[in-house]
Amino acid sequence: MKLNNNGLENKNAWEAAGYALPQYDRETVAARTKQNPFWIHFGAGNIFRAFQANVVQDLLNKGDLDRGLVVAEGYDYEIIEKMNHPHDDYSILVTLKANGTVEKTVVGSVMESLALDSEDDAQFSRLKEIFSADSLQMATFTITEKGYNLYGSDGSFMPAVAADMAAGPQKPASYIGKVASLLYARFLAGEKPIAMVSMDNCSHNGDKLAAAITAFAEGWVKNGLADEAFEAYVKTSGKVSFPWTMIDKITPRPDASIEEILKKDGVEELDPVVTSKNTYVAPFVNAEECQYLVIEDNFPNGRPALEKGGLIFTTRETVDKVEKMKVCTCLNPLHTALAVYGCLLGYNLISEEMKNPSLKKLVEVIGYKEGLPVVINPGILDPKEFIDTVLNVRIPNPFMPDTPQRIATDTSQKLAIRFGETIKAYAAAPSLNVADLKLIPLVFAGWLRYLMGVDDNGNAFTPSPDPMLAEASSYVADVKLGEAFDAKKTLAPILSNAKIWGVDLCALGMDTLVCDYFTELTAGTGAVAATLAKYTA
């Protein structure tokens, strides 16, 4: 059983092994898509294959769509060359259900895959052709939050971006430069309308994409390298829109135990590929069943009825409320709390942590008691039900190979949003008192303890990558387990850093509690477990 056109001709073998197959004539759909593309997606990674591609497959199966997707990869061209093309753009989606069953689907909704490579004339010309098509309604993106960043740490354009600004839209090298070049092709083809839709997991994602594209339009026009009407085109929402979205589906990297299941079924050539850019890709993707995609309904060239596939279309204000609900209260803070303490207590699976009564109570209190009183209710999703699903279905799912180490990545960049917003809301509400927050400060103290790089048994571990790791770790570098130290003096410089926490913890008076907790957490080996048990009892 090979995952390609030839291998899938043997439908009976696949179906007998329990795989759901595409229920449409792929050749016909591919021909229609090539002629009249309606949706191109940038970022051929796991979330796209597990979510957007599968939604389109469902709609093709039901006859609600007659065309499929085009996907372009601009960060790592080897994904297209080594994964998409050998498998004729098929992939296997393994849905990991909380009850222990797995659902296996061969997803065939991607009809064409291209490298977003301006040095490859054939592929870049084809992308320009797609972008010039009247039929194209939307370009969507999962390129990670940093994919939209054009600036270096000194605030000036990164070298590739600066070079593109000076050279114009012909052969840009930077990711967004290449996308802006394609949009310029659409402009030149008659200022055709399009929705440019970021589906990355960051708040106000549409604004991030808009700012990046607009910077190129302004730069090229200013330098006399593009028609001056291009800038107005990009800035006119009736022509080019940048809707906000909220996406939520946990898609860990392809797991070896899932690979074994597929091998036993008789699927061949499943070996994952690690590209020269260190991207880890496999012909299959594993993901949780739960998924949410809420989209601001602003599509100047129309859109397909994706609500039939479970996507929610609404106003920008509602997208913002859903995003805040998830990121500031109902999911992300709980994930970070488990990530920090999971690493300290030696866990390798987030799901296993929910069997620890102290950790379970920690996230229940942070979610229901500390977070819910200030949650923003978006109306289209109920915050309490959302937390119920997170704590009872999603996080405890034993078949989700998600790790605290993965989630602990970049924690310094996440604390301000995931906890700082709740603290600000408490500080602003006359009926609430910041002093009533007891376990959010325990997470802060836990992160400072984590920065020591020593687990609760006294063994060294390597903290996950984080741009502030060296700086933040330096504040606790002299703290040793079981040795006396002045917590307030040691931690004051970092606790007053509002960039990290979203607020100045010293000014709010929360520093005392964080310091007290930190002193207890560093009392010796076993102190982390003991402190958690004490404050969650």
Residue ranges and their predicted role:
Residues 1-42, 46-537:
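Substrate/ligand-engaging "lid" and interaction regions
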